[in-house]
Amino acid sequence: FLRMAGLRRGLLRPSCVICVPSGATWVERRSLAAAAEALRPRCHARLVDETVAAAAGAGFDLAAGAGAFIVDIGGGTTEVAVLAGGHVVRAQSLRVGGNAMDEAIVNAVRAELGLLLGRNAARSLKMALGLADGTPGSMETVGVDAGRRTPRVEQVSAWLVASALEHCVTAIGDAVQEMLSDIPPNLAEDVVRGKVRIAGGGALLPGLASRIEAAAGIPALVVDDPLRCVVLGAAEILEHGGTYPPSGEPSG
């Protein structure tokens, strides 16, 4: 991966930012740094918590020491974090993300309709119907009949998709609620004024922001460019490195 990113021998004193999940161990973090060093001995590799990069990309003024609340929903995990400036105050990593949502839809459609779906078809249903919350509607999809093993066209209801996603969405909402229940008083005003900001590909799920807002009890919004939020934040950190602490650095 580091070679694909362009961190290879021959570059002149390259610098890079490597974003790591909040749940990454010290061993995993050191291994990443060592891998970067092995590819380019004079490389300046900077490890940064993914939630810090997401918050920077979401427009939080971390340089001013502001408090921030970020929910980063990726393919495999969801990162929920409270930050003060460039420091992670509290974070939680969930094994729930866009892939788990797709799998839940695949399983629900097979159980209810006897139809085998591919991941792309499940993803299309997810993005088109989302969290319908009782709104009637359906979408046509094509899969394989589980019994006959032949192609079949089927209408999938919005209710079925929303029901399939309920477990994943509830887990994210519970994590947000738990994080807010233990927020330091000195950060409360910043978090309320800055709102819960949702990033990552999973943020594009229709209806998700309103569900998170209901769980949080404070306003929530999807950032302007959720798919590139972490990358944009990493670029910001690379350009203004001194403003942001390295991953795992004590905040005191």
Whereabouts are the PLM-identified features?
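Nucleotide/phosphate-binding catalytic cleft detector across ATP-hydrolyzing
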Residues: 1-70, 83-197, 203-252
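Short acidic, Gly/Ser-rich segments with clustered Asp/Glu that frequently serve as metal-coordination loops
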Residues: 75-77
